[in-house]
Design a protein with these regions (language model features):
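N-terminal "arm"/small-domain region of PLP-dependent enzymes with the aminotransferase-like
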Residues: 1-31, 36, 229-231
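Generic structural signal for small/hydrophobic residues in well-ordered secondary structure
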Residues: 22-23, 45, 63, 78-79, ...
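Hydrophobic/aromatic ligand-binding patch that stacks against planar heteroaromatic rings
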Residues: 91-92, 145, 187, 242
Length: 260
């Protein structure tokens, strides 16, 4: 009987003959922190997400906090949904903002755009929606709300890797910021990790700095261990090459994971 049980919660891991040689190459390359494998993973994600502005980070929660920082929510309020994991809302508090609850659509569990608009306040800095259960929110209505009131729209798409809205992948510039999780129980995992996509190239460039202390890793400057020019302080949110190696291997299996 035990042999016939369906492993409902078994984590997807690529075949060992694919994954282990790739991991071995990374582990013994001399570079296991943020490096070429992270860049490779981001480049591989771009066509999957329909967006060239892709930042790999160390968790979905970090992706959300980075998006909230880029949106400038500190000192204001964020209209969001109570129908979500605590990890959606904790970054709002971490960024010094106040969550304001909007009602949900009882048919989908997603945030109700009409009630979200009613809940806007003078100090509202962003709307934070969740694609509940992987079913996309009404992005047309939410982005319309954002455009009317000058408020950026952030999407927690932890459940929605591979989903589409209006024929475009979730992660495309249909939202100002889209955040994914690569934690252990998501569609694909990098053991832990996250992804942030941005609509605006300027937000992407700023986010690239803020995910690693605020230091420009691409600039020609003195060794950051002895001196660095940091115009704006940042976080330690970057992904490492070991996680990215797993991510690259996992992406090849995403279509079959989505069909399962």
């Amino acid at each position: 009987l035990a042999a016939n049980l369906i492993p409902l919660f078994k984590v997807h891991v690529p075949p060992r003959e694919e994954l282990l040689p790739a991991l071995e190459a990374t582990l013994y390359s001399g570079q296991v922190g943020q490096g070429p494998r992270v860049e490779e993973f981001e480049a591989a994600l771009a066509p999957v997400l329909g967006n060239r502005n892709v930042l790999a980070v160390n968790s979905g929660t970090s992706a959300l906090q980075l998006a909230l920082r880029l949106a400038g929510v500190r000192g204001g309020s964020v209209v969001t949904t109570p129908m979500t994991c605590a990890a959606t809302v904790l970054p709002v508090l971490a960024e010094g903002a106040r969550p304001v609850w909007a009602d949900i659509d009882p048919a989908t569990g997603n945030i109700d755009p009409l009630d979200a608009e009613r809940k806007l306040q003078a100090d509202t800095r962003a709307v934070l929606a969740v694609h509940w259960g992987g079913q996309p929110c009404d992005m047309g209505a939410l982005m319309g709300l954002g455009a009317r009131h000058g408020v950026p729209v952030i999407v927690d798409a932890a459940h929605a890797l591979g989903a589409q809205w209006a024929g475009e992948p979730v992660g495309s510039p249909a939202a100002d910021f889209t955040c994914f999780s690569l934690q252990a129980i998501k569609h694909i995992t990098t053991i832990d990790g996250g992804i942030l996509t941005t609509r605006d190239a300027g937000d992407y460039r700023r986010g690239k700095l803020l995910r690693w202390y605020g230091i420009d890793r691409d600039a020609e400057q003195a060794d950051a261990r002895v001196g660095a020019d940091i115009p704006e302080w940042g976080y330690k949110f970057h992904m490492n090459d070991v996680a990215a190696t797993i991510g690259v291997a996992q992406l090849a299996h995403l279509p079959q994971v989505l069909k399962a």
